Amino acid sequence: MKTRFFFNISLQDSIFFKNKKMKILITKTPGKEDIEFLWSKLREHGLSKISNPEVEEKFLFAILAKEGEVIQGGLLGQVYYKGMHVQLLWVDESLRKSGIGSSLLQKAEELARESKCNLIYLDTFSFQAPKFYEKWGFEVFGKIENFPDNFTRYFLVKRLL
């Protein structure tokens, strides 16, 4: 069962935007259908502005490092608008600095080039791997300091063309 939190701008149950009566709902457990609806509407709007079939290709992917049936490392990402977003790269702690992360990132870059991506982008925290990504040719284009406290979140990009 979903828990919904109501946020009222005034004492009224509803508010008006452009003569339409609406409620503003906050939920910490959004339903799959709500998430899919919002993403589809955002994508629909974006594609209406771009309208280039080459740019429209979109797919999710995973690159896994497995020992037998056990995942020892992996990279999740998404390709869209001629770019690749690396959502996460993880390697089992006992195998870090063994080359698995480099192999996963190299395979992702190969996939990005095959998919005609112009760039790869990602984010990482100061306690994770910003130096690792810089070693692979990524450049910091933004950062948020003290997020979380005493750490920095870095945003990096690698241009492929």
Task: Give, region by region, the residue ranges found by the protein language model.
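Conserved active-site tyrosine of GNAT-family acetyltransferases
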Residues: L38, Y133, F138
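Conserved GNAT acetyl-CoA-binding A-motif
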Residues: A112-F125
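Conserved catalytic-core motifs of GNAT/GCN5-like acyltransferases
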Residues: S48, Y121-D123, E139-F155
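Acetyl-CoA-dependent GNAT
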Residues: I24-Q87, D92, F127, N146, ...
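Conserved N-terminal entry element of GNAT/NAT acetyltransferase domains
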Residues: T3-P30
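Short glycine/proline-centered loop/turn elements that form peptide/ligand docking sites
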Residues: G101, L105, S126-A129, N146-T152
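Conserved acetyl-CoA-binding loop-helix of GNAT-fold acetyltransferases
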Residues: K97-E110, K135
